[in-house]
Regions:
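N-terminal active-site segment of His-dependent metallophosphoesterases
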Residues: 1-48
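Active-site-proximal beta-strand elements of phosphoester/diester hydrolases
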Residues: 2-10, 123-130, 191-193
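Residue-level marker for buried hydrophobic side chains located in beta-strands
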Residues: 5, 29-31, 57-58, 125, ...
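Divalent metal-coordination and catalytic microenvironments
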Residues: 8, 34, 49, 60-61, ...
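Active-site environment of divalent metal-dependent phosphoester hydrolases
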Residues: 10-15, 37-40, 64-67, 134, ...
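Active-site neighborhood of divalent metal-dependent phosphoester bond hydrolases
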Residues: 38-116, 121-122, 147-148
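His/acidic metal-ligating clusters that form di-metal
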Residues: 98-172
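Conserved beta-sheet core of the metallophosphoesterase superfamily
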Residues: 141-220
């Protein structure tokens, strides 16, 4: 058994199918949010992750926008649509109301973070967007990007694994250069595993025991067809 994490698949069915097939039934899987929106397959991805045994699904900002949009007012629906929610809204509109309600109940129960200590004794904290001292501040755990610019805030022997900001965008913002669509490492304390699957056509699966990543390419799935 191994323990893996992935984030921000954003409706890319090719990425989820590759990762799903890579995972053994006994592997534990942490999904760090944002299964839906931008791409066409988000609802299917969300449902399959929710149904998978040995899995913790952490809430992302797109799950929150979906929840707010379906339970809220026109402004919440507009914000969700503006951020890529149209493909998800289209699928949900064709689902039975009872199925949508059941899905909303599952989303509402999603945690905002999870912790895992790997075999090397490293405490790994996983949230959608990053780390905050106040782990009750759910808004920061799904939206914050300011922690990229802060030094010395991570406790010793602790690693933050997150998504939310595609690594190409993050590196442009902080002036670092890595190959497009690859994982970002920050001095052994933070790992961003959002490789921007819906833009770069690359998705990441991080082994939390070894801290080694595996990259999946859309071109590989097309070649296999």
């Amino acid at each position: 058994m191994a323990v893996y994490a992935c984030a921000d698949l954003h409706g890319q069915g090719w990425a989820w199918d590759a990762i799903k097939n890579r995972l053994a039934p006994s592997d534990y899987f942490y999904f760090l949010g944002d299964a839906v929106d931008r791409g066409p397959d988000g609802v299917r991805i969300m449902q399959e992750i929710l149904d998978r045994p040995n899995t913790t699904y952490i809430r992302g900002n797109h799950e929150q926008m979906m929840l707010d949009g379906l339970c809220g007012n026109d402004d919440a629906i507009a914000l969700w649509a503006y951020n890529g929610g149209w493909p998800t809204q289209k699928v949900l509109a064709n689902m039975p109301d009872t199925d949508v309600e059941s899905l909303l109940q599952e989303i509402e129960a999603l945690p905002f973070y999870a912790e895992y200590t790997n075999p090397d004794g490293i405490r790994i904290i996983m949230t959608h967007s990053g780390y905050t001292f106040d782990m009750s501040d759910w808004y920061k755990m799904i939206w914050d990007r300011t922690h990229y610019y802060k030094e010395g805030m991570i406790p010793a022997n602790t690693l933050i694994v997150h998504g939310h900001t595609p690594t190409p965008s993050l590196c442009r913002a902080i002036g670092e250069v890595i190959p497009e669509g690859m994982v970002w490492y920050d001095n052994g304390h933070k790992i961003d595993i959002d490789t921007g699957a819906c833009f770069t056509r690359k998705a990441c699966l991080l082994n939390l025991d070894t801290l080694e990543e595996e990259i999946f390419y859309e071109s590989d799935s097309l070649d296999a067809e």
